[in-house]
Design a protein with these regions (language model features):
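A residue-level detector for the "anchor" residue at the start of short, highly conserved motifs
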Residues: 1-218
């Protein structure tokens, strides 16, 4: 449900935090390697096991680890990138390009890897880890955060979809902490700070690839 965070303990004692409208599939016990499937966003605190790898399968790519903490944002939306943020330890990112060639990227703590589903390519950069994982505590933390990233966090938390009609708005950055506040209250912050205008529509009124409520931004 929108705004809800749930926790799951896997058979190997790995802890998983699931963001709103996120789903994880895993066996009742791990026989060989530890494989799970994810749609949505989750934070993993993986129990170290030197004999078996832990793999997170998303519709676009895989993340492979031994024991570490990381965040994966892989909601089922073809227009959005899949993002993996490493908190500590190390992970390997496995994906195939448009020609079917396999690639492996080893990530370092503090890095975020963004996989473009259309181009089948990965961009790696440094992340504001506190902001990325703030959803675990029911918060949205913005620290000079770009509009695109701010809207991404709000979309994940409230199960909505923003359509920005004015590209000039992407020039703004935002700072603030929202805890247990309604979507309308958060939108008011953007209205007053950047003079944005919002139009909320029902997803049945126009085509939405996600089935979410659409919020147009002017």
């Amino acid at each position: 449900s929108a705004g809800m965070v749930s926790t799951v303990t896997l058979p190997d004692s790995t802890q998983v935090w699931l963001n709103s409208n996120s789903y994880i599939k895993y066996p009742t016990r791990f026989v060989a390697d530890r494989d799970v499937e994810l749609v949505g966003e989750a934070y993993f605190k993986v129990t170290r096991d030197g004999r078996t790898r832990f793999r997170v399968h998303t519709p676009a790519m895989q993340v492979e680890v031994m024991g570490t903490e990381f965040n994966v944002d892989a909601y089922d939306n073809p227009r959005r990138t899949v993002r993996t943020t490493l908190v500590n330890g190390s992970v390997n990112l496995l994906y195939s390009d448009n020609e079917g060639r396999g690639h492996v990227i080893e990530m370092m703590p503090g890095q975020c890897a963004s996989f473009d589903k259309t181009l089948k390519s990965v961009t790696v950069g440094m992340a504001d880890v506190e902001s990325v994982v703030s959803w675990r505590e029911g918060k949205i933390v913005l620290n000079r955060t770009s509009l695109a990233d701010a809207f991404r966090m709000i979309e994940n938390h409230f199960n909505v979809e923003f359509v920005v009609r004015n590209p000039m708005l992407y020039e703004h950055n935002f700072t603030g902490v929202f805890a247990d506040q309604s979507l309308e209250t958060i939108l008011d912050h953007f209205r007053y700070s950047s003079h944005m205008h919002f139009r909320r529509t029902d997803p049945r009124d126009r085509a939405s690839v996600t089935g979410r409520e659409i919020i147009e931004v002017y």
